[in-house]
Every structure is written in structure tokens, then in C-alpha cells.
Amino acid sequence: SGIDGDEAWATGAALADVDNDGDLDLYVCNYDSPNALYLNDGSGKFREAAEEYGLAQVDACLVPSFCDYDRDGDLDVFLLTNRYYRKGGRPVEPPFEEVAGGRPRVKPEFSKYYGLKEKSPGSYGMDEVGRPDLLLRNDGGKFTDVSDESGIRVDGHGLSATWWDYDHDGLMDLYVCNDFADPDNLFRNNGDGTFTDTITSVVNYTPWFSMGADAGDINNDG
């Protein structure tokens, strides 16, 4: 079939018509190695084309979630990330250093693994940090990172991402489940390419250790 995966540590995958030709392609998230896109040629054969499409990101990618959020006729993708795990575990020596007259900072070689958390005024401790999630817009066969301009880039320990139109305005919104010390996010689609996190005004309670979410009309009210 042409799908081999090499020796990458695959963490999540989705079937979606990425090239908009009427058949399902396969997109695979890999941990700390390039993500893979296998395009379906319609005969049971696939070819790898992640670099060509701008989808060969290298990060702590976990789950891809496809949706045509901008309603232009092709599928965009939200890449959920989690965190990097340092080989050998936590370092013996503190991974941060003191800065004269200011807050301590994480040493550059540890910055993708750890962050500083203020435990009390002037007292800091080490904390594992989640990686920033990515929103990639499909611009006719080439994906563009619009995470910052869309307002959807959030660092967290993401575990699932669910698209659905929660406010019934015809635009797909996004619910992101985060684990550990990170709150969930509910990104309302503003219709102009930007999103607003409305979680605190819409959802009264979130567990702060979410691992999955789904949506449905439970009370059958439309």
C-alpha cells in the first residue's frame, strides 16, 4: 500500500480527504519526528507527501483533527500536542538559573521540557510544560500555520480536540481537552479567521484533567 511509517513513534492518526479528490487520505502524528501524510491514489496505493503539503511538523504531536473551519471547501487541521519527555527523566541539577534583579529563567537546553511555576511570592519550582497546539489552514493544497493570528495557540497537555457548532451560528467551534494543570479550551469561531476562548463563560465546570470529549443533543432540544 505504500504505508510503512519507518521507525517513527506514531501517536495518533486521522482519515480525511486532504487533497480534496474524493477519497480518504491518511495523516499520522509522530512524536519528535516529522508527521506523515499518505495520499490515496484511488487504487489502494498511497504516497507520502507531508513535506509537499506543509504537514511535516516535528513536535510532541498527538492527535490531528480535521475540519473546514473557514468554509472554503477544503479541510483544515488542528494539531493537538502534549509534551516532550526528557531522556533520563528530570535532571539532577536544577534546569533553571538565577537572573540578576529578576525572575529565574529556564536554561535553553531544557526549555522544551520545563517551565517555572511560582509556588509563592519569589519562590519558583520546576514544572513540565505542554507544547503549543497548532492550527493549520489549507490554502488550496498547502497548509499554513495560522495559530497565532487566529488566537488559537495555547500551551497545554492536550489529549483530544472536538469540532462542533456549539452556538448554532453555522461555524465550527473547537473544544480542547487538556490534562494535568491546564484548563480546557472552548474556541468560538468568530467567522473572520479568529477564535475566542469562551470556556469560562459557557462551561460552568471543567475537571482540569480531561482526556476526551464528545458532543450531542442529549436532551433532544435541537
Model-derived regions: residue spans:
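Acidic, glycine/proline-rich Ca2+-coordinating loop motifs
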Residues: 1-222
